[in-house]
């Protein structure tokens, strides 16, 4: 199984969260190969200075090239909240799963409509770096639920 976490976020070594991301990638290896793809370019930076709508369009343009294969799931605070068991079902029986974390202004509705699903981790606002860690933990938890591993107890 292959899981991609595709996020609109500046690339770079984050000394606080990066070790946690690497930890979850490593412990997920028996179940899936997890890759984090960070996207941020001059076009996105410029669009964010113009307007929220321009920013969303630039996010869609950057993210759409990853929509081609597998199950596509956007993290969207306005979407359905899921618990860990519902989240695990999203991973079950899939060869490739792509998770999308939008930029500061979220997703265009058109991008969300191109995804197979959109889920929320709740109504609180989390930084991109922190939501990436939460997603990585939930991916590992979901994989362990699906494989009857004792982690989820």
Curated annotation (Swiss-Prot):
GO cellular component: cytoplasm
Stored Pfam families: SPOUT_MTase
Binding site for S-adenosyl-L-methionine: 63, 102, 121-126
Locations listed in the record: Cytoplasm
Principal location listed in the UniProt entry: cytoplasm
Single annotated GO MF: rRNA (pseudouridine-N3-)-methyltransferase activity
InterPro entries: Alpha/beta_knot_MTases, RlmH-like, tRNA_m1G_MTases_N
Top-level taxon of origin: Bacteria
Ribonucleoprotein among keywords: no
EC number(s) from the headed UniProt entry: 2.1.1.177
Catalytic activity, as annotated: pseudouridine(1915) in 23S rRNA + S-adenosyl-L-methionine = N(3)-methylpseudouridine(1915) in 23S rRNA + S-adenosyl-L-homocysteine + H(+)
Keyword field: Cytoplasm, Methyltransferase, rRNA processing, S-adenosyl-L-methionine, Transferase
Protein family per UniProt: Belongs to the RNA methyltransferase RlmH family.
UniProt xrefs under HAMAP family: 23SrRNA_methyltr_H
Subunit structure: Homodimer.
The protein's role, per its UniProt record: Specifically methylates the pseudouridine at position 1915 (m3Psi1915) in 23S rRNA.
Name of the molecule in the record: Ribosomal RNA large subunit methyltransferase H
């Amino acid at each position: 199984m292959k899981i991609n976490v595709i996020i609109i976020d500046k690339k770079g070594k984050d000394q606080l969260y990066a070790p946690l991301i690497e930890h979850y990638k490593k412990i997920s290896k028996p179940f899936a190969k997890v890759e984090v793809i960070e996207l941020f370019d001059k076009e996105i930076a410029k669009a964010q200075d113009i307007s929220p709508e321009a920013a969303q369009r630039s996010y869609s343009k950057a993210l759409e090239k990853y929509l081609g294969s597998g199950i596509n799931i956007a993290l969207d605070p306005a979407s359905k909240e899921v618990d860990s068991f519902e989240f695990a079902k999203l991973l079950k029986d899939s060869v490739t799963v792509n998770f999308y974390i939008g930029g500061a202004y979220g997703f265009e509705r058109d991008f969300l409509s191109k995804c197979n699903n959109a889920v929320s981790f709740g109504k609180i606002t989390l930084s991109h770096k922190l939501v990436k860690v939460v997603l990585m933990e939930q991916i590992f938890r979901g994989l362990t639920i699906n494989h009857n591993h004792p982690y989820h107890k």
